[in-house]
């Protein structure tokens, strides 16, 4: 049994110093748990902060925006509006498609939201049109969330209809089954179909109308149960040739008889194998393609999901003909991997720099090894806690660990420095470890809990920003707590066994030179400190001026929300006049795409034209531009966007909107630009009056760029004004008119062809190639009640009007969204102020409400809570320090160091040209926890000297400053060098890390210079005030 030494010191470290085996095994357990946790942690770009979002898409080919709104969107919205936990509901009704996006509260599980949505769709089914070709389809993805992978499938030998069919049945379904895949959407889908193009003249010559033909086709192609015959010994299943499966089958179909002669479909129509929707198209670079956009499920390991898809691709490609080519054009995990790898390198660099600082100051290999062990042990042990808390390895958690590198070594340095001091005085290492650790234990606890207290307010931040930084704060707090445990257990134990008087006194040329250097620095600091202590009011003036300067700089500095990252992908929207046709839009888009591909920074692109669940109107096309890797291009993404937009001006009649794809997606709708501002009214008329006025005002605002809107009410409309009296006399109903028009111009899906693998549609339309434009309406024929064929022009007049291309709702009311980018050298805060001012100057009526959306709304919430967050951090730290010191005064002295850090951080941001965004705010909050360490170390030793050695406050604080100068300088440099790699980072995702590094470095430099002088002066001031208060005579007793 080990004999306990008589020295009763050691405090909480005593047991661990005296039991080295138990201490070592405890640390090994922490290390192993961390390694296992690291291997099991998922990898992502950022913490999981997605709002539970579900998109409901309903296709109704041929329907106008007004019909889609009233017949589909409105009934669905009424049902969705009754769901609990719904945060926001936005819808867009365009020609042939209704898209409703439902965003739920952060706390609501996505599976619960899914059940609510399914129930609401079921309730609305009876209210939807009976001829709806497809039921509403919902998907558990955010439409604004960019895909993790984009595949392009092309073929030089096969038609796109066959390629699409193979992609849908052999590729898309298999990929959808991969764990982590949320949705696979097919853009440019040319789904095979039989297209029946009626010849209007032939139909009229035979005395037929389109409704008769539609009914004949529908009745001729059926697929239903027929029963079976069950005899005494055998059972026979009944089957029939009731299915027509090819264009040849339909050509021979008899649709009517005239004078005993059969009228076949081929006599009055052209029947061909074609695409179900001829107004959809996609391209990979310049080649027609079927594009697969693969989106993730919320909360999955995006790296693992992408890897699983890539692993199965070779097998999927083998199932396709050799003439079909499959390429991965976009892989967002490439930049995620690169960004995480860069942060991991910066983490290792920070560790190396911190170890270097330790050696420079301690000048002793054993003394350097001890805190160097504490750093990786604390960081690796944190991974175990991250795993159990459900966190991931992402940019923010790795940034927290990088910053923690400078924090976790502080405690070990303070312990080693104090123990070494006693060893150098001649005490035995074990006694020195017990005495030094016991003396410094309270300081370590004070430093740790006061620093963790600063992070507590981050845990209570609300909404998306709070969820975003929760992992950052908890990861950092866990690393700090583990470092405190290591510093109070392993560090003193190693000191007792690795340090000795001889090893500490042993010097080489470097250590001797550095010792002389530090002695001179401390001596010079002592002289300056005496001068400052003898002129306290000047120092107090400097301290007070830093507070005023902090407030002034906060008011002046540009403010933003989240750094714009260069992820190598640009999302583009090409907008043409509202009356543009599909073919003309496709031609314009391909011209622009060809020029984009000539840019030296562009590697590839995909483009799409048509109306689907993402693209709302025919006059807008989507582009996804993939840039070359950052190492292969000289420019960052803002410069490339500027150049591409300037290039697009050579194409008249189109406008190109570009925005970089970001890891953080808060919006719920695909937008042309980065930020959105919504107007909501009770009627479309109010919006049609005020949206153009506000748009004109904002387009003249210098703080804004690329101002546009989804308000489009200048689409051409051919209004069929039916004389109801005349129609009634002829026995023609409005239903007959609508059916005739739908049959002719709606790409109407009139029948279904069933196969073993898929289902295909029969599409009915008029062949308008011979009579384009409004003249085609003259070919419409209807059947009167007595069987006479009546031209449409007999009972109706055609009027050309303007109408909406889409109808947008927000929470069931008409809305319009104005999208914008921030111009030039302006900040998001300045842009928001400019919009608010323009709205005020325009004096909008009270029944029009306005609201920022997405990232801009989150920015306003974050900005409004910044001061409260900082105040909460200060109050939390004051409470912790007050409890630890049992004093109201000493915490104030410690907190007096904070303005110096604020000044340094804000000045550094302004000098670097950075905005005060949420990343920088986190840096400032961390500085609050760091810079007070200097004051704690000074005040702890000053109070101990007053209490134990009977020193005066002046002598006590002077001695404390000199004794703690070296560990203060060492810990500050360690924290500074831990943040330096973040400030100097240039790789992928550097934009995210840069503000944090700039804040930390700037704040630490400024606070280190000032607090070494202001803290002792303020300590003496408050000590004097406290003594004067205690010396006041007691109140005399009343007689």
From Swiss-Prot:
GO terms for cellular component: plasma membrane. InterPro entries: AcrB_DN_DC_subdom (IPR027463), Acrflvin-R (IPR001036), Multidrug-R_MdtB (IPR022831). The keyword NAD does not apply. It comes from the Bacteria. It is found in: Cell inner membrane. It holds the Pfam family ACR_tran. Its main location: membrane. It is a multi-pass membrane protein. The chain crosses the membrane at residues 16-36, 342-362, 373-393, 396-416, 440-460, 472-492, 537-557, 863-883, 888-908, 911-931, 968-988, 1002-1022. Part of a tripartite efflux system composed of MdtA, MdtB and MdtC. MdtB forms a heteromultimer with MdtC. Belongs to the resistance-nodulation-cell division (RND) (TC 2.A.6) family. MdtB subfamily. This is Multidrug resistance protein MdtB. It comes from Serratia proteamaculans (strain 568).
């Amino acid at each position: 049994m080990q004999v306990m030494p008589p020295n009763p010191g050691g405090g909480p470290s005593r047991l661990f110093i005296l039991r080295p085996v138990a201490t070592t095994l405890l640390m090994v357990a922490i290390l192993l748990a961390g390694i296992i946790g690291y291997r099991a942690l998922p990898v992502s770009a950022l913490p999981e902060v997605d709002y539970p979002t579900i998109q409901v898409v309903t296709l109704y080919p041929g329907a106008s925006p007004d019909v889609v709104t009233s017949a589909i969107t409105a009934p669905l919205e009424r049902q969705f509006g009754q769901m609990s936990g719904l945060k926001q509901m936005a819808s867009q009704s365009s020609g042939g498609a209704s898209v409703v996006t439902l965003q739920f509260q952060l706390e609501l599980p996505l599976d619960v939201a899914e059940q609510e949505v399914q129930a609401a769709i079921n309730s609305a089914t009876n209210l939807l049109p009976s001829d709806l070709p497809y039921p509403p389809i919902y998907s558990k993805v955010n439409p604004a969330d960019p895909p993790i992978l984009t595949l392009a499938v092309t073929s030089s030998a096969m038609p796109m209809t066959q390629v699409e069919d193979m992609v849908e049945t052999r590729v898309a379904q298999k990929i959808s089954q991969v764990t982590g895949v949320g949705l696979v959407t097919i853009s440019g889908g040319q789904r095979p179909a039989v297209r029946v193009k009626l010849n209007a003249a032939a139909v009229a010559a035979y005395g037929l109308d389109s409704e008769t033909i539609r009914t004949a086709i529908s009745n001729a192609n059926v697929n239903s149960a027929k029963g079976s015959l069950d005899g005494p010994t055998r059972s026979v299943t009944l089957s029939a040739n009731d299915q027509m499966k090819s264009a040849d089958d339909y050509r021979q179909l008899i649709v009517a008889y005239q004078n005993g002669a059969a009228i076949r479909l081929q006599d009055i129509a052209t029947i061909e194998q074609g695409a179900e929707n001829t107004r959809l198209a996609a391209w990979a670079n310049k080649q027609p393609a079927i594009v697969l956009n693969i989106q993730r499920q919320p909360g999955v390991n995006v790296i693992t999901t992408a890897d699983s898809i890539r692993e199965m691709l070779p097998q999927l490609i083998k199932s396709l003909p050799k003439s079909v080519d499959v390429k991965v054009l976009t892989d967002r995990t490439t930049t995620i991997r690169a960004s995480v790898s860069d942060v991991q390198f910066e983490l290792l660099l920070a560790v190396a720099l911190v170890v270097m600082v330790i050696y420079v100051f301690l000048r002793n290999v054993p003394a350097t090894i001890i805190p160097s062990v504490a750093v990786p042990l604390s960081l690796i042990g944190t991974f175990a806690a991250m795993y159990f808390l459900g966190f991931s390895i992402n940019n923010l958690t790795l940034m927290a660990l990088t910053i923690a590198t400078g924090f976790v070594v502080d405690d070990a340095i303070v312990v080693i420095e104090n123990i070494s001091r006693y060893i150098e005085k001649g005490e035995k290492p074990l006694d020195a470890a017990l005495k030094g650790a016991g003396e410094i234990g309270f300081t370590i606890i004070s430093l740790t809990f006061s620093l963790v207290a600063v992070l507590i307010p981050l845990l209570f931040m609300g909404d998306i920003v709070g969820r975003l930084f929760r992992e950052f704060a908890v990861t950092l707090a866990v690393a700090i707590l583990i470092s405190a445990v290591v510093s109070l257990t392993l560090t003193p134990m190693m000191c007792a066994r690795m340090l000795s008087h001889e090893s500490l006194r042993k010097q080489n040329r470097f250590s001797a030179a550095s010792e002389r250097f530090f002695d001179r620095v401390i001596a010079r600091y002592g002289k300056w400190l005496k001068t400052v202590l003898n002129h306290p009011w000047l120092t107090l003036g400097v301290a007070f001026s830093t507070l005023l300067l902090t407030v002034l700089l906060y008011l002046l500095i540009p403010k933003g929300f989240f750094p714009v990252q260069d992820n190598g992908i640009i999302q583009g929207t090409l907008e043409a006049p509202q009356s543009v046709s599909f073919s003309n839009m496709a031609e314009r888009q391909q011209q622009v795409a060809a020029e984009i591909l000539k840019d030296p920074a562009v590697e590839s692109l995909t483009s799409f034209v048509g109306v689907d669940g993402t693209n709302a109107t025919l006059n807008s096309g989507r582009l996804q531009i993939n840039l070359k890797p950052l190492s292969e291009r000289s420019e960052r993404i803002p410069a490339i966007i500027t150049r591409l937009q300037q290039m697009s001006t050579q194409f008249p009649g189109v406008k190109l909107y570009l925005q970089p794809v970001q890891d953080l997606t808060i919006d719920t709708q695909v937008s042309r630009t980065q930020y959105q501002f919504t107007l909501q009214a009770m009627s479309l008329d109010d919006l049609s009056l005020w949206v153009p006025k506000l748009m004109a005002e904002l387009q003249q605002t210098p703080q804004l760029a690329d101002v546009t809107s989804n308000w489009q009410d200048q689409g051409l409309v051919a209004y069929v004004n039916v004389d109801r009296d005349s129609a009634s006399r002829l026995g023609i109903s409005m239903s007959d008119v609508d059916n005739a028009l739908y049959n002719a111009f709606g790409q109407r899906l009139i029948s279904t062809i069933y196969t073993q693998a898929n289902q295909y549609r029969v599409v009915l339309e008029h062949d308008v190639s011979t009579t384009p434009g409004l003249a085609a309406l003259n070919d419409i024929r209807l059947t009167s009640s007595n069987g006479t064929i009546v031209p449409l022009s007999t009972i109706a007049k055609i009027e050309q009007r303007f109408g909406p291309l889409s109808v947008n709702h927000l929470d069931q009311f008409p809305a319009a969204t104005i999208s914008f980018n921030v111009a030039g050298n302006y900040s998001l805060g300045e842009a928001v102020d400019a919009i608010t001012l323009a709205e005020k100057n325009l004096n909008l009526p009270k029944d029009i409400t306005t609201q920022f959306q997405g990232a801009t709304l989150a920015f306003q919430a974050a900005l409004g809570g910044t001061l409260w967050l900082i105040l909460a951090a200060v109050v939390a730290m004051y409470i912790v320090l007050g409890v630890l010191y049992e004093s109201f005064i000493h915490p104030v002295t410690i907190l007096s160091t904070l303005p110096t850090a604020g000044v340094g951080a804000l000045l550094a941001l302004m000098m670097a040209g950075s905005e005060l965004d949420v990343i920088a705010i986190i840096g400032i909050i961390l500085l609050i926890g760091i810079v007070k360490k200097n004051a704690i170390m000074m005040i702890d030793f000053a109070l101990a000297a007053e209490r134990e050695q009977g020193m005066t406050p002046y002598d006590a604080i002077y001695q404390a400053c000199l004794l703690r100068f070296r560990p203060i300088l060492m810990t500050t440099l360690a924290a500074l060098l831990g943040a330096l790699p973040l400030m100097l980072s240039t790789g992928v995702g550097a934009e995210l890390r840069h503000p944090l590094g700039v804040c930390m470095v700037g704040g630490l430099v400024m606070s280190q210079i000032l607090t070494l002088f202001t803290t002792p002066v303020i300590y003496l001031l408050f000590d004097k005030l406290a003594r004067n208060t205690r010396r006041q005579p007691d109140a005399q007793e009343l007689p």
